[in-house]
UniProtKB/Swiss-Prot annotation:
Binds directly to 23S rRNA. The L1 stalk is quite mobile in the ribosome, and is involved in E site tRNA release. Belongs to the universal ribosomal protein uL1 family. The keyword Iron-sulfur does not apply. One of its GO terms (biological process) is regulation of translation. The keyword Repressor applies. It comes from Rickettsia rickettsii (strain Sheila Smith). GO terms for cellular component: large ribosomal subunit. InterPro entries: Ribosom_uL1_bac-type (IPR005878), Ribosomal_uL1 (IPR002143), Ribosomal_uL1-like (IPR023674), Ribosomal_uL1/biogenesis (IPR028364), Ribosomal_uL1_3-a/b-sand (IPR016095), Ribosomal_uL1_CS (IPR023673). This is Large ribosomal subunit protein uL1. Keywords: Repressor, Ribonucleoprotein, Ribosomal protein, RNA-binding, rRNA-binding, Translation regulation, tRNA-binding. Pfam families: Ribosomal_L1. GO terms for molecular function: rRNA binding; structural constituent of ribosome; tRNA binding. Part of the 50S ribosomal subunit.
Length: 239
């Protein structure tokens, strides 16, 4: 009896996937509004998926003058709970705690990192402790957690840095082949909020275009949801 039920569930699940995929046409280009609507209607998973963006840039990320990297404060947030660690001198620890940091300290946090215990999503540091943090740069760097003044995570303004991290600040960085990938909120967000996040992110990446770049900068753009369909964006619809 249980086998029949399992088969019925699998058939039902497969049907939902097929029906969802039929709502998105692989040979069609969508504007942002239509893309969000399609992805919502095509989602079949039982959890709240993330809206993801992939941008293909006409850069060669092997050249230092063509690096595209930065942060964006998403107007509607990410929908995720962000754990923030602040590494600073003892006299500023209380300030960091009051501002909402989840982990605060100096050598204690660095020792935990060395031991492989990384229980945070963002690491913020004051300039006066960066020399000490250098000892774990090879651990934090590959994970995208190394504090960086260009990203606002090496700063004297601890309070504002924590606020930005908690409220929906997203880092972007062009990887090999000029690909940028980021999550921009939950599919349960209103269409308006998702579009606000999308427009803010796209605008930031476009503004980050390397000054000396020749040729087309934005080559292709795709939106998708976690375990869901993917749609290609009509670049002529991007203002």
């Amino acid at each position: 009896m249980s086998n029949k039920k399992d088969i019925a569930v699998k058939i039902s699940g497969g049907k939902k996937i097929r029906e969802a995929r039929e709502k998105v046409k692989s040979d069609t280009l969508y504007n942002l509004t239509n893309a969000v609507e399609r992805l919502k209607s095509a989602s079949y998973v039982k959890f709240d998926p993330t809206l993801e963006i992939v941008m293909k840039l006409g850069i060669d990320s092997r050249h230092s003058d063509q690096m595209v990297r930065g942060v964006v404060n998403l107007p509607a947030g990410t929908g995720k709970t962000v754990r923030v660690a602040v590494i600073c001198k003892e006299e500023r620890e209380e300030e960091a705690k009051s501002a909402g940091a989840d982990l605060v300290g100096s050598t204690n946090i660095i020792d935990e990192i060395k031991a492989g215990k990384i229980n945070f999503d963002v690491c913020i540091a004051t300039p006066d402790v960066m020399a000490a943090i250098g000892s774990v740069a090879r651990i934090l760097g590959p994970k995208g957690l190394m504090p960086n003044p260009k990203l606002g995570t090496v700063t004297l303004d601890i309070k504002n840095a924590i606020k930005n991290a908690k409220s929906g600040q997203v880092e972007y960085r062009a990887e090999k082949a000029g690909i940028i990938h980021a999550g921009l909120g939950k599919l349960s967000f209103s269409d308006q909020d998702l579009l606000k996040n999308l427009n803010a992110f796209i605008e930031a990446v476009i503004k980050a275009k390397p000054a000396g770049l020749k040729g087309s900068y934005l080559k292709a753009m795709y939106l998708s949801s976690t375990m869901g369909a993917s749609v290609q964006i009509d670049l002529t619809s991007i203002a």
